[in-house]
Regions:
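Active-site-adjacent betaalpha module
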Residues: 1-53, 60-63, 89, 96-97, ...
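A short alpha/beta connector and helix-capping loop motif
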Residues: 50, 67-94, 98-106
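Short, solvent-exposed loop/turn segments at secondary-structure junctions
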Residues: 61, 108-109
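Surface-exposed, active-site-proximal loop segments in enzymatic domains
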Residues: 65-75, 116-118, 263
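Short catalytic/ligand-binding loop motif for oxyanion handling, primarily in non-cytosolic enzymes
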Residues: 110-114
Length: 311
């Protein structure tokens, strides 16, 4: 029998590697009545559910609703597949193990909008383009991109943070006010469909699910929910003593990835649910992120592995 190895020098913040079982214990010496062990793409890991949270990122109408994100092709989109994996397996598994569910969403205030840096304003569309969606002088003032990585965004949707989307046709003669882009309490910034129902059902005191750990909806004003110091998410995690984070949502390489890497730098344990995340970015973006998470920032697992985690 080989001796366990401590990873880290801080007496309150360390892991333990158990070579005989190839398991990394992330519990930091805390006692748990029901620690769980789950498989990842590398080691098996052991976590304390009481110190863990499933962070579901940006599953909002703006990013998912077919009224503003029409499907291309016949099959389900990557985001739809991730949504089903979470709804059918990932979220129920987290609840069954007693893991807190955090809904991390864009939800801007007027102050956020007035202090938003230009880089983020550009991301969501703020300057004029030609009707074709291409810059009039493209090729004259920019370098070539090979392969072509220039993304043509829908100008009806990407019209600028805080800009009113106007009426949104939901089908069957049903129309809703889309509201201002990603502003708090607007339709477009609300949780999408089944995720909204899932959140509200958990918050309902009559629901017989995880009453001791109600879901929490936390707003963010950047791609990362943990940027800077003292974010709403960071304050909540510190108050609850949460040290292990399982990540899901959209987009893998943008808001999910930004929050994950900030969490890694702040010392949280980072676990990516690869089938519970998605992105529309081509060029193998998801695989690159999974590779980096597995080899550098933490661990990669699946919703099924979470469901089948042993106690």
């Amino acid at each position: 029998m080989r001796s366990p190895q401590t990873i880290g020098h801080d007496a309150t913040n360390f892991w333990v590697y158990e070579p005989d079982s190839d398991t990394i214990d992330l519990c930091r010496g805390t006692k748990s009545n029901d620690p769980i062990s789950l498989k990842t793409t590398r080691n098996q890991i052991r976590i304390n559910p009481q110190k863990s949270a499933l962070v579901v990122i940006d599953m909002q109408n703006f990013f998912l609703h077919p009224a503003v994100r029409p499907r291309v092709g016949n099959g389900p989109t990557a985001a739809e597949e991730a949504a089903q994996a979470l709804l059918n397996t990932g979220i129920p598994a987290a609840r069954a193990h007693g893991i807190r569910v955090i809904w991390l969403c864009w939800g801007l205030t007027e102050h956020d909008l007035n202090t938003m840096p230009p880089g983020l304003m550009r991301t969501f569309g703020t300057y004029d383009t030609s009707p074709s969606g291409a810059k009039q002088n493209e090729g004259e003032t920019s370098l070539p991109s090979a392969p072509n990585m220039i993304r043509k965004k829908n100008p009806a949707l990407y019209k600028g943070l805080g800009t009113d989307l106007g009426d949104v046709e939901l089908g069957d003669d049903n129309t809703v006010q889309g509201g201002r882009v990603l502003m708090r309490d607007s339709w477009n910034a609300a949780l999408y469909d089944q995720f909204d129902k899932e959140y509200k059902a958990n918050r309902d005191s009559r629901a017989d699910i995880t009453r001791k750990k109600p879901d929490v909806l936390i707003h963010k004003d950047r791609m990362s929910g943990l940027w800077g110091s003292g974010s709403e998410l960071e304050i909540f995690l510190e108050q609850e003593g949460i040290t292990t984070l399982l990540f899901a949502g959209v987009n893998t390489d943008q808001c999910v990835g930004s929050t994950l890497t900030d969490a890694y730098s702040k010392g949280y344990d980072c676990i990516l649910l690869r089938d519970g995340t998605a992105t529309g970015t081509p060029f193998g973006a998801s695989e690159v992120w999974e590779c980096n998470v597995s080899n550098c920032w933490g661990f990669v697992t699946t919703c099924d592995a979470l469901e089948n985690a042993s106690t």
